[in-house]
């Protein structure tokens, strides 16, 4: 396959990630405003500042974003996300925004992460509904995701539903302590929930196989996906 043209913006995060990707793959770089040849394969970080529009027009793309595990530090305050460092892992996905977790990869990369796996919970008081950002609602064209998903979940369970997003005051880690299940569009927080013994369910077609909402009262955590996901994320040094 041809080397991708790396599309960068003026944002520091995008420029840093794109520069490192281009350096590692020996690829050419092009500013998002100057890119016109949509027959080319591209690579870029994030979906803001014109990158999503380019992604929609090309046939093949590599998408870069925060990883599945051991992500870089971030804070979420006043409706803004602040990246505290770039020491964590970043995912790279071909022709999608997130990996489906399928495959038969070994466990060597997963072991390097030193993750702590908790056994699947057998009890729980409520279901966490992880609300996607407005940006992701637009990307996936699901403007009424929260309302539609609440209705869907209520078809299969009468458990209490707690809506949570990255700006919620109560930390997700605290909520997971008494949660029965975690439901999201495609949030990587779903994998953190699984690490904490809370089964995750996704509405995105790419991830639906991990947990189907119709099975929310008889959940099973498939730990095999973690080996595969660990092979889809890298540090800047790598």
Locate each region found by the language model.
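Donor nucleotide-activated moiety binding/catalytic core segment of transferases
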Residues: 30-36, 54, 151, 159-210
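Structural motif
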Residues: 40-41, 126, 180-181
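A short, gly/pro- and small-residue-rich
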Residues: 48-80, 147, 195-209
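Leloir-type glycosyltransferase catalytic cores
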Residues: 75-124, 156, 210-238
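Short catalytic/ligand-binding loop motif for oxyanion handling, primarily in non-cytosolic enzymes
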Residues: 15-17, 50-54, 69-73, 135-139, ...
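Short loop/turn segments at strand-loop or loop-helix junctions that form parts
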Residues: 9, 64-68, 125-136, 204-205
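N-terminal pre-catalytic "stem/leader" segment of glycosyltransferase-like enzymes
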Residues: 1-53, 135-136
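Conserved catalytic-core segment of nucleotide-activated headgroup transferases in glycan assembly
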Residues: 122-167
């Amino acid at each position: 396959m041809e080397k991708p043209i790396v599309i960068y913006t003026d944002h520091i995060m995008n420029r840093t990630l794109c520069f490192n990707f281009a350096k590692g793959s020996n690829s050419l770089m092009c500013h998002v405003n100057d890119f016109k040849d949509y027959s080319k394969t591209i690579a870029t970080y994030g979906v803001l500042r014109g990158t999503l529009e380019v992604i929609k027009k090309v046939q093949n793309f590599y998408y870069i974003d925060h990883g599945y595990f051991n992500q870089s530090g971030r804070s979420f305050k006043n409706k803004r996300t602040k990246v505290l460092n770039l020491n964590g892992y970043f995912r790279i996905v071909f022709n999608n925004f997130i990996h489906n977790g399928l495959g038969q990869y070994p466990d060597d990369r997963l072991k390097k992460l030193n993750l702590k796996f908790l056994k699947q919970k057998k009890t729980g008081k409520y279901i966490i509904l992880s609300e996607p950002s407005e940006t992701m609602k637009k990307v996936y064209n699901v403007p009424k995701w929260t309302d539609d998903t609440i209705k869907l979940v209520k078809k299969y369970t009468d458990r209490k539903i707690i809506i949570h997003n990255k700006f919620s005051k109560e930390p997700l880690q605290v909520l997971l302590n008494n949660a029965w299940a975690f439901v999201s569009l495609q949030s990587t927080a779903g994998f953190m929930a699984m690490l904490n013994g809370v089964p995750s369910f996704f509405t995105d077609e790419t991830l639906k196989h991990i947990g189907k909402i119709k099975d929310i009262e008889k959940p099973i955590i498939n730990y095999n996906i973690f080996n595969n996901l660990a092979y889809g994320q890298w540090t800047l040094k790598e």
